[in-house]
Amino acid sequence: MENFNELLQKYADFIVRVGVNPQPGQTLIINCPLEGAPLARLCVRSAYEAGARDVQVNWQDDAVTRIRMELGSEDALTDHKGWQLRRYLDYAESEGGVCVLHLIADDPELFAGLDGAKISRVNSANRSFMQPWREYTMNDRVQWSIAALPAEPWAKKMFPELDTAAAIEAQWKLIFDTCRVTGGDPVGEWQKHLDRLNELGAKMNALDLESVHFESANGTDLTVGLAEQAVWESAGSKNEKGVPFLPNIPTEEVFTAPHKDKVDGIVYGTKPYVFNGQLIKNFHVTFKDGKVVEHGADEGADLLGQLLDTDEGARHIGEVALVPASSPINRSGKLFYNTLFDENAACHIAFGDSYPGTTVGGTGLSKEELAARGMNHSSLHEDVMIGAEDSEITGKCRDGRTVPLFENGVWVL
């Protein structure tokens, strides 16, 4: 690819300076697959140049992860040690604090053919063990960001007609394009984009909505009641000290918290979804009083059931997000088989935990106070795509008005 090194440097600088935004004296932890070493090295340098006190890199390898899941005993895989959690909490509680950058290149079918029930139990135990740290990120107490890079299994899944080298190059180009890196001024392009998302969020909040209704020709007919004092958020976030960061790169969504007991109707998935390294395709779920009461899928139905059975909160939703069909990711015409991208190609809901920041003052409330507002709690938060090219979305205001939000899959607000 022409000027690849220049684009990679721009991408690294953007991920660090705008995405995770380490502050002087702060430690940055980078979680990265082995394939991402060139990008990680650029991020390490950029972070130090931004004033980071220290940069720690945790290397990961999908092949080893699969072997451990296949051959390791469940007891061993869930035998957690205190240091695995403390290495995050110790930095978070230190004077300078911590921020975390996740560089991902997940194989969409990493665990294909393995025992799905075992995978679900192991991953559930891992989430529960790391819950104290997860609360730091779910509450935006620290900066965190997720960005992607190509790897052979993922690239070949997206571009099966190409050889490996060409598939990886095509994937890099797509990542650079959808992350707005290929222009002359990525930061300026992103600022315009974030301003537009913030404007939409402000308009949604001004409507004082009670619920939103989704309808499309595939059979979706879903009403999502909103949590009390729900706040529509957009791409950018701030940590507890007011430091801005960008959790997801790319991002196209405006989102809020549903009321966990006020979701009713049926919804059909519009894109495959990867859960525990396996695919769920053409799913549907039916809600009554906020809870999933029936579900199915053409592929991965058992896997969907395992997701929903994770805990009580997994059968309720913690997020509803609006994304137009005109988003650059959807316009690319490619299915990414990766939630970071696919959730930004279509409207989506998330089974599981609510973000406390999507209700007024939520990051300062107790779990009981959040629950009283209708916020959901779960050990997981899994986004599934429900937006279609013909999606019609209307909002019902608390004063009784009905307002069109989307027509034919795009914003009309």
PLM regions: where:
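Active-site bordering "gate/hinge" segments
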Residues: 1-264, 401, 411-413
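Dual-mode signal for accessory low-complexity, basic/Gly-rich regions
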Residues: 292-363
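Short, glycine-/Ser/Thr-/acidic-enriched flexible segments
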Residues: 35-36, 106-108, 151, 219, ...
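Short polybasic amphipathic segments
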Residues: 211-214, 283-286, 389-398
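Extended hydrophobic packing segments that form well-structured cores
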Residues: 368-413
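Short solvent-exposed loop/turn micro-motifs enriched in small/polar/acidic residues
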Residues: 13, 205-207, 276-279, 313, ...
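Active-site lining segments that contact anionic ligands and/or coordinate catalytic metals
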Residues: 262-264, 280-282, 289, 315-319, ...
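Long, well-ordered mid-to-C-terminal structural blocks that present hydrophobic/aromatic surfaces
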Residues: 254-312
